[in-house]
């Protein structure tokens, strides 16, 4: 019985660590994104929208950023048909293959092949609220995953 309880404890501890992500590794992955996107209190739209508060944010919600124009398969059309939120599941799919999620979106990035890089990037982005202030990323990820 003690062995079962110990094994269960290790299993639970392992899953918590795996879902938490690594901020330093996520920041390193974000460097690929930083050409077009910014985060933090002084973030500004560039080629891509600012990513403050992206985890849990509705699609197309950054004022002043020109998203892909309407038409089948674009962000605007998808929003009108079925409003979406950038939750963990949607972000994971998008970061793996952006064109699969938004076929006619204007983001040129082809995606991240490694699941761990995606997990770490989402965790890194989750630390920024809508104003770019730092918050607990684990709480944001947990709320977004539910």
PLM features per residue range, with description:
Residues 16, 47, 103-105:
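Residue-level signal for beta-strand positions within conserved beta-sheet cores that form or flank
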């Amino acid at each position: 019985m003690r062995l079962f309880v110990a094994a269960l404890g290790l299993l639970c501890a392992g899953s918590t660590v795996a879902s938490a992500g690594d901020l330093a590794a996520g920041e390193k992955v974000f460097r690929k994104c930083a050409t077009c996107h910014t985060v933090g209190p002084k973030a500004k739209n560039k080629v891509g929208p600012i990513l403050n508060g992206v985890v849990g944010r509705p699609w197309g919600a950054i004022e002043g950023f020109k998203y892909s124009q309407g038409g089948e398969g674009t962000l605007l059309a998808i929003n009108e048909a079925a409003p979406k939120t950038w939750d963990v599941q949607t972000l994971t799919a998008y970061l793996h293959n952006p064109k699969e999620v938004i076929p006619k979106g204007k983001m040129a990035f082809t995606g991240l092949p490694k699941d761990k890089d995606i997990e770490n990037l989402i965790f890194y982005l989750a630390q920024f609220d809508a104003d770019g202030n730092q918050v607990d990323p684990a709480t944001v990820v947990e709320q977004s995953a539910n």
